[in-house]
């Protein structure tokens, strides 16, 4: 009772302080002695006085915000510890709806006004090249350019180089795909190991030779198989600059579908490996093969301390435009950056491909003659019918003149007299003969050039960084700085076309089953990293490290590398051969199973009340997994908890850094179930049947759904007992609409069930925030009405089907070449609809032949109840050349603008361009897409990367799956015929703009609201339910685990807490990498009564007091991938992040 009084008093105190503070503010502004009334005339001095008053008012608001924040923390502390009365139970009203009483705990939504300034933008200079504007202004015509088909004729004056020689760097390279036509291991065995073995011997033959490598995954495998002498030689070659490892990631990742967690993780894995084994730190980025480029990647490379980068696969019309305006080299800047802290120097290759015919100059017929692997007698030749000729004394002058002409023409497209000429292709240099042919012939050409000053050319072999260093030197700037006159660019390079209207927008969806599995593995990896790091730190602090399975670190390392491998631009993209896809799938599943073990082991240790009782037994795990997959291409099957006379315990893991109020659904073997909290309080639950089809329930399996509050990054405990509590075990009611179909229906005495043979009337589901209408005919969503609004918002959902062209060029794994607009999906039979209603959730499932569409509405306060949970179970294995799309039609006046995320890191505005074909207007959607007008925003959140567009105002359209019977002539040699039953998961969030908050139309940036960010996190990081194994008696106690002393500010995301490897072997060190991301957010969307706790702190976090029961004994800010310390370690553990920034810290917990 005493605690309850304290809570009441503190709650009242907040109100009083707020009112009193506002009174003081107004009072101080009103009675200012310097203020005079001027009858409406405001001289300049008065305006400045007014500005001062406004600034003072802002300062006072800020102070007020801080006071309330402090009081809020006190109240939350009190309420968290309060053993209040049991919560009121849900009840059923006369009008047929469930009411869940409000929670006794207060919720806070307290955002500092200063934190709202960032999204308003308007600071800093605009870049010369904004890609959204470039795309709007370009004609995208495809005029024949002569020998450079997609470009133009290039001419020059031979005297252009009289004042300054042309400096040419020829960069030998071999592009090794970690899986595409062959599996990773097969490529390694048959080609890659031979390339790297030859590299060591051939580079040592002549110190003038150079070689560029990118994929650390292959390099690490090779390293494990070579002897000490060869390793020493490799270190020497790296040390003297003959061998450069560019980018240094585990793979060269896809930039469309990959999530930024995985992009960073594979970069860290590569960089850490290079530092440990070679002492190498990458300086330049090399991305010749990803199919379009995200602006997230330059940000990550810059924060990893790289100074330059190169890209290749950009739309041919953009390449031509940039070549014509000498803009192929630019400083790439983030759209939100108000100065130049995110700038990185970027080189865009000008021609069609990264192969030799398209890299020496504009004429592939001539360049092919200088690819000496194609000398007569070899296995490949020149398609232009003029073969290369070996360079001799007799022909060197003529051959050199021909090549120099190409070099000079290519250099006319750039601003400096330093020229980059890559020399390589896929899996090149795999035989010693090729090394000899290329290096000997080119060296003869270089010797000829360099011995004739009248030619004004200096040519040599080089690495990528050799080229960039020479360019910086020529332009007189420090490495990475902006050379005078070079443009600044912001935006991204999607979508990509390599010729005609062949847009590479199909791979945004291709093989969605594995795109989904990728994200499941990612969420498990992050969860396992965090729990493992916390468990190891707590075990060390308690002196129990010897008992804890620290060897799980090898499982973590393998999973990091599996996730990294799958970010490769032929893996997550869905563009590999079927056997290679199976290989990836098997790897993904193996790592997923291993990560579940890591999570179980860590949760077991952390949830024990008495750590001394901890005993690790791999043969008899303390916890069970939440679900299992029978094979890599099967959907998960949830664990059924067997109830009997003794209670069963379940440990719940919340991977979010925010406290979470969520619905947890468990499967049990009886409808007679009681659920108790950790303290033994009985909880209200909703019990439902578990369905195997539209009308058939699984016998002896029931779903029990219970709302639970879980600590940030923490563990909660539930107890399940056999028995019935009529007040708290609340059954769902079910209606099944058969639409005239003759089907048998499972019935159960525990659940009221009504069968409706032919009803077609629309019906609604509702919760405390909204009423949602569905079509009685289709079972699909029709409209949403928020409870505080009179009018409903049209949100009309449809299923559509795309065909492919009848002409020669058809859609395939890469390309989307539809036969026109999509047509409505016409089912053979009307759908069966199953409507479930209950106290905590209601849902509608529409069963069609090719898609089961479920929409669920949670009747909970906070994030869970503010959006619709949507899942689409898709099976198109009987389709021929068709693609299935989900279409949402609204009356939002979006004016041709829509927004898609880039890698889950940032949002990029898009404009529907009528001048381009339909397929050009599709973009990647890794986590969200939205449309908006002055009043509303509708966001579709996704748990897997898919392709999205808005083809008309007020519409969003997502491609769910594609089945294509033919190759699209990009080297794969297969169609997409290995479709799986795939579950795509979404959240649909409707938000209203607050009065007076403008939509930032003219801006090149846009930001989700805080609610939207949290909704995405809930979808992508679900709570895990881990039952305590039956044979394990929990003994004296399982206790919830609260790792954080206080929640992080709600604009902060703890991206990872990653245990670092020890120097000597595969064991963990005592250090972890803490990676934080401060998100940019839009304050202009409704933020009242949201029912969840959220405060911001102007970017400040006290890391020293963040972890409960652990001290931060060492803290070192570093570059993104930990290769560079950014400041000396200090005693202060307070850190500050600007919005949108990601920061990495090396820390030791003890």
From Swiss-Prot:
One annotated GO biological process: protein glycosylation
Transmembrane portions of the chain: 6-26
Keyword tags: Disulfide bond, Glycoprotein, Glycosidase, Golgi apparatus, Hydrolase, Membrane, Metal-binding, Signal-anchor, Transmembrane, Transmembrane helix, Zinc
GO CC, alphabetical: Golgi membrane
Recorded superkingdom: Eukaryota
InterPro entries (UniProt xref): Gal_mutarotase_sf_dom, Glyco_hydro/deAcase_b/a-brl, Glyco_hydro_38_C, Glyco_hydro_38_cen, Glyco_hydro_38_cen_sf, Glyco_hydro_38_N, Glyco_hydro_38_N_sf, Glyco_hydro_57/38_cen_sf
Glycosylated residues in this chain: 95, 305, 1093, 1131
Assembly behavior: Homodimer; disulfide-linked. Interacts with MGAT4D.
Function: Catalyzes the first committed step in the biosynthesis of complex N-glycans. It controls conversion of high mannose to complex N-glycans; the final hydrolytic step in the N-glycan maturation pathway.
Family: Belongs to the glycosyl hydrolase 38 family.
UniProt name for this protein: Alpha-mannosidase 2x
Natural source organism: Homo sapiens
Gene name of the record: MAN2A2
């Amino acid at each position: 009772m005493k605690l309850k009084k304290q809570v009441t008093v503190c709650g009242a105190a907040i109100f009083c302080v707020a009112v009193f503070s506002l009174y003081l503010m107004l009072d101080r502004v009103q009675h200012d002695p310097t203020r005079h009334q001027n009858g409406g005339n405001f001289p300049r001095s008065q305006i400045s006085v007014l500005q001062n008053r406004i600034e003072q008012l802002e300062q006072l608001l800020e102070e007020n915000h801080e006071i309330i924040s402090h009081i809020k923390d006190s109240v939350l502390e009190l309420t968290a510890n309060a053993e209040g009365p049991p919560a009121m139970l849900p009840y059923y009203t006369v009008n047929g709806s469930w009411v869940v009483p409000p929670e006794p705990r207060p919720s806070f939504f307290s955002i500092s006004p200063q934190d709202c300034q960032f999204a308003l933008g308007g600071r800093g200079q605009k870049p010369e090249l904004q890609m959204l504007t470039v795309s709007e202004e370009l004609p995208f015509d495809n005029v024949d350019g002569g020998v450079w088909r997609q470009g133009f004729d290039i001419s020059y004056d031979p005297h252009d180089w009289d004042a300054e020689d042309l400096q040419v760097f020829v960069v030998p390279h071999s592009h090794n795909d970690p899986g595409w036509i062959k599996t990773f291991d097969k490529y390694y065995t048959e080609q890659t190991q031979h390339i790297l073995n030859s590299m060591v011997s051939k580079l040592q033959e002549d110190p003038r030779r150079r070689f560029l490598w990118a994929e650390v995954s292959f390099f690490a495998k090779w390293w494990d198989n070579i002897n000490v002498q060869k390793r020493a030689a490799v270190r020497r070659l790296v040390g003297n600059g003959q061998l450069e490892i560019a980018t240094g990631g585990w793979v060269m990742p896809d930039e469309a579908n990959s999530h930024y967690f995985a992009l960073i993780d594979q970069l860290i894995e590569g960089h850490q490996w290079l530092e440990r084994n070679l002492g190498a730190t990458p300086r330049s980025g090399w991305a010749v093969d990803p199919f379009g480029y995200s602006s997230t990647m330059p940000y990550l490379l810059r924060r990893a301390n790289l100074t330059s980068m190169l890209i290749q696969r950009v739309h041919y019309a953009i390449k031509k435009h940039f070549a014509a305006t000498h803009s192929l080299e630019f400083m790439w800047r983030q759209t939100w950056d108000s100065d130049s802290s995110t700038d990185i120097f970027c080189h865009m290759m000008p021609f069609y491909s990264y192969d030799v015919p398209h890299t020496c100059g504009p004429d592939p017929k001539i360049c092919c003659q200088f690819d000496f692997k194609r000398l007569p007698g070899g296995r490949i030749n020149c398609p232009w019918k003029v073969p290369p000729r070996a360079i001799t004394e007799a022909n060197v002058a003529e051959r050199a003149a021909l090549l120099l002409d190409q070099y000079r023409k290519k250099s006319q497209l750039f601003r400096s007299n330093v020229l980059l000429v890559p020399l390589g292709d896929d899996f090149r240099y795999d035989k010693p003969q090729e090394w000899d042919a290329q290096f000997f012939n080119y060296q003869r050409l270089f010797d000829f050039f360099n011995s004739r000053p009248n030619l004004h050319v200096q040519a040599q072999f080089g690495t990528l960084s050799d080229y960039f260093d020479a360019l910086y030197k020529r332009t007189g700037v420090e490495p990475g700085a902006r050379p005078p006159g070079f443009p600044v660019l912001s935006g991204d390079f999607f979508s990509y076309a390599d010729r005609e209207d062949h847009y590479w927008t199909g791979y945004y969806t291709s093989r969605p089953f594995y795109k989904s599995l990728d994200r499941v593995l990612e969420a498990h990896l992050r969860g396992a990293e965090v729990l493992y790091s916390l468990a190891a730190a707590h075990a060390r602090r308690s002196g129990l490290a010897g008992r804890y399975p620290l060897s799980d670190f090898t499982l973590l390392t393998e999973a990091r590398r599996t996730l990294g491998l799958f970010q490769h631009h032929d893996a997550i993209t869905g563009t590999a051969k079927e056997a290679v896809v199976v290989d990836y799938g098997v790897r993904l599943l193996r790592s997923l199973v291993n990560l579940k073990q890591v999570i179980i082991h860590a949760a077991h240790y952390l949830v024990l009340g008495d750590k001394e009782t901890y005993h690790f037994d791999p043969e008899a795990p303390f916890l069970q997994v939440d679900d299992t997959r029978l094979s890599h291409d099967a959907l998960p099957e949830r664990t059924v908890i067997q109830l009997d006379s003794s209670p069963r315990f379940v440990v719940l893991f919340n991977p979010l850094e925010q406290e979470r109020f969520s619905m947890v659904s468990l499967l049990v073997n009886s409808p007679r179930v009681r659920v108790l909290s950790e303290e033994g309080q009985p909880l209200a639950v909703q019990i439902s049947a578990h369905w195997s089809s539209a009308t058939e329930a699984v016998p002896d399996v029931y779903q029990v759904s219970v709302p639970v509050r879980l600590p940030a990054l923490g563990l909660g405990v539930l107890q399940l007992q056999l028995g019935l509590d009529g007040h708290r075990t609340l059954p769902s009611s079910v209606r099944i609409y058969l639409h005239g179909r003759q089907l048998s229906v499972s019935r159960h005495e525990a659940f009221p069930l009504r069968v409706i043979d032919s009803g077609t009337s629309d019906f609604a589901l509702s919760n405390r925030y909204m009423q949602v209408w569905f079509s009685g005919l289709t079972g699909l969503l029709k409209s949403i009405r928020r409870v505080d609004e009179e009018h409903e918002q049209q949100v009309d959902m449809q299923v559509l089907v795309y065909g492919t062209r009848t002409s020669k060029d058809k859609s395939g794994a890469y390309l989307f070449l539809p036969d026109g607009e999509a047509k409505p999906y016409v089912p053979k039979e009307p759908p069966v609809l199953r409507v479930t209603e209950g106290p905590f959730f209601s849902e509608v499932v529409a069963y069609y032949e090719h898609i089961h569409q479920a929409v669920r509405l949670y009747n909970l306060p906070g994030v869970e109840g503010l959006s619709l949970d949507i899942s689409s179970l898709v099976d198109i294995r009987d389709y021929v050349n068709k693609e299935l799309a989900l279409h949402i039609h609204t009356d939002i006046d979006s004016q041709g603008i829509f927004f898609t995320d880039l890698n889950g890191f940032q949002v990029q505005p898009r404009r529907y361009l009528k001048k381009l074909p339909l397929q050009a207007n599709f973009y990647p959607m890794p986590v969200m897409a939205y449309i908006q007008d002055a009043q509303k925003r509708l966001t579709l959140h996704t748990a897997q990367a898919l392709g999205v567009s808005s083809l008309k105002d007020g519409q969003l359209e997502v491609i769910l799956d594609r089945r294509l019977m033919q190759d699209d002539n990009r080297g794969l040699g297969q169609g997409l015929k290995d479709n799986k039953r795939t579950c795509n998961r979404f959240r649909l969030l409707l938000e209203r703009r607050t009065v007076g908050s403008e939509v930032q139309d003219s801006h090149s940036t846009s930001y989700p609201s805080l609610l939207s960010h949290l909704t995405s996190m809930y979808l992508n990081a679900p709570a895990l339910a881990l039952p305590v194994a039956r044979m394990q008696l929990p003994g004296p106690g399982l206790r919830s685990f609260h790792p954080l002393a206080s929640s992080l500010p709600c604009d902060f995301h703890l991206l990872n807490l990653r245990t670092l490897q020890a120097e000597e072997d595969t064991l963990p060190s005592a250090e972890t990498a803490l990676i934080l991301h401060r998100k940019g957010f839009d304050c202009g969307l409704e933020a009242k009564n949201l029912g969840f706790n959220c405060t911001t702190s102007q970017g400040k976090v006290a890391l020293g007091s963040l972890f409960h029961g652990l001290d931060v004994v060492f803290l070192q800010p570093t570059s993104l991938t930990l290769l560079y310390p950014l400041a000396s370690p200090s005693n202060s553990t307070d850190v500050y992040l600007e919005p949108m920034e990601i920061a990495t810290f090396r820390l030791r917990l003890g």
